[in-house]
Regions:
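Solvent-exposed, well-ordered amphipathic alpha-helical segments
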Residues: 175, 219-222
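Substrate-binding cleft and catalytic face of glycoside hydrolase catalytic domains
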Residues: 10-190, 194-196
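Glycan-processing catalytic domains of CAZymes
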Residues: 3-5
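Beta-propeller domains
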Residues: 189-207, 221-226
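Distinct, well-ordered alpha-helical segments
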Residues: 1, 149-150, 198-215
Length: 227
């Protein structure tokens, strides 16, 4: 850790903030009433009777290490076709039938809101202010290299080319969370992908679609994977 502190000022978790680590490989659900009692945000359009339990143990541990050692973090990632459990896209979180778009819209809102709120509340607990540790979020990862080998976002929203509604919605939700905590001027939202230098125009088309008709630029950067 001393080497990291001497040579670097931020780190990115490889797997600990990916959806399958927070949601779990198998569903653990609770009733909406139980979730509200625990402080979970439930969207107005959420019509299901249960929600997934979210596990932040490893995320909290990383935030604590960062705060203790004066390091920043890049949060990776909220929406990805890979390393998101298939059950998250299933009807009632429990079978092999796909859920529908309206239900998935509400689940996306539930997940992004609760993950970002938890991180920023933890930052406030550790340092006194939100946005003090996580300076960037990879909101959507590798949409342009999406694969359909398992149940995922494209099962629900189909192939939308350069105009995927759930990708734009993810950035709208994430930016809304930054504004709710008044950190939109110090935390940046990224679209993250690899081989971006091979498909520059396609990447720009996607980012322009995300920002189109928005009052503010909700996607402010492109992450170029260099590992």
């Amino acid at each position: 850790l001393n080497f990291v502190k001497n040579q670097f000022n931020s780190f990115t978790l490889e797997n600990e903030m990916k959806p399958d680590n927070i949601l779990g490989y198998r569903p653990t659900t609770m009733t909406v009433a139980e979730a509200k009692a625990k402080g979970y945000y439930i969207p107005d359009n959420y019509k299901e009777s249960t929600v997934p339990s979210l596990n932040f143990r490893e995320v909290d541990g990383a935030l604590e290490v960062a705060a203790k050692n004066g390091l920043k973090m890049r949060a990776h990632t909220l929406v990805w076709h890979s390393q998101t459990p298939a059950w998250f896209f299933s009807d009632k979180y429990e079978n092999d039938k796909d859920t529908n778009v309206a239900t998935m819209d509400a689940r996306e809102d539930f997940y992004i809101h609760n993950v970002m709120a938890h991180v920023m509340e933890k930052e406030k607990e550790l340092t006194g202010s939100a946005g003090s540790i996580v300076y960037a979020w990879d909101v959507v990862n590798e949409y342009l290299h999406r694969q359909e080998f398992t149940r995922t976002w494209t099962n629900i929203y189909k192939n939308s080319g350069d105009t995927p509604s759930y990708v734009k919605k993810a950035f709208e939700l994430a930016y809304g969370m930054l504004k709710a905590y008044n950190v939109q001027d110090k935390v940046t939202l990224f679209y993250n992908d690899y081989n971006t230098y091979f498909g520059i125009q396609q990447t720009l088309n996607l980012v322009n679609f995300i920002n189109k008709d928005e009052p503010e630029k909700i996607c402010s950067g492109i992450g170029m994977q260099s590992h």
